[in-house]
Swiss-Prot record:
Region (Disordered) location: 1-66
Protein name: Protein GrpE
Subunit relationships: Homodimer.
Cytoplasm among keywords: yes
Length: 207
């Protein structure tokens, strides 16, 4: 009887020990789980903080880049405004200079024409014979040609082959002696200055 009681006591002690071991294992597991959870939470928190720092750096860099772009845009606008103003001043200045050149050219031409007008007025006002009048006109023509020479105006050559760039054909004739496309007669003289045609020579052309 007493022996059975001892056996039961031993079994109870073993069960208690097993329960204690199991409880300790559970506590250890819970402690490990808690540690792992804390570690994971800590790592997640660190990752969040790092992501927030990266986001802040990105925003800061973007703001700096935007500021730099705005400054460059403002500088470009300023340069554009200055260039526009400079071009406008240049355009006005060149227009004024061009107007001055034209005005000077007109004056130079008129200086040569006025003496011709003087000669014509004197010829009309003079009391003389037809010969005197003719002589006065001839002098006026000479003065006109001299003025043309000073202005660089030349008479267009109308001899030889017809040139549509220089001549204006107002009549055509058949003349085997002259040959084809040759100026047969000049009706009105033409003039040029350098490569500019003042007036084409009016001619008759042989076909």
């Amino acid at each position: 009887m007493e022996e059975n009681r001892d056996v039961k006591n031993e079994e109870l002690e073993k069960e208690e020990i097993a329960d204690e071991v199991a409880e300790k294992d559970n506590e250890t597991q819970e402690s490990n789980d808690a540690a792992e959870t804390n570690e994971a939470s800590k790592e997640a928190s660190e990752n969040i903080e790092a992501a927030e720092e990266d986001q802040e750096d990105l925003v800061k860099n973007q703001e700096e880049e935007n500021k730099k772009l705005r400054e460059e845009l403002d500088a470009t606008k300023d340069r554009l405004l200055r260039l526009t103003a400079e071009y406008d001043n240049y355009r006005k200045r060149t227009a004024k200079e061009k107007e001055g050149i034209y005005s000077d050219a007109y004056v130079d031409v008129l200086k040569e024409i006025v003496p011709i007008l003087d000669n014509l007025e004197r010829a009309v006002a003079a009391d003389g014979s037809i010969e005197d009048l003719k002589k006065g006109i001839e002098m006026t023509i000479k003065g006109c040609k001299d003025s043309f020479a000073k202005l660089g105006v030349e008479e267009i050559d109308a001899t030889g082959e017809f040139d549509p760039n220089l001549h204006n054909a107002v009549m055509h004739i058949e003349d085997e002696e002259l040959g084809k496309n040759v100026v047969a007669e000049v009706f009105q003289k033409g003039y040029k200055k350098d490569d500019k045609i003042i007036r084409h020579t009016m001619v008759k052309v042989a076909n």
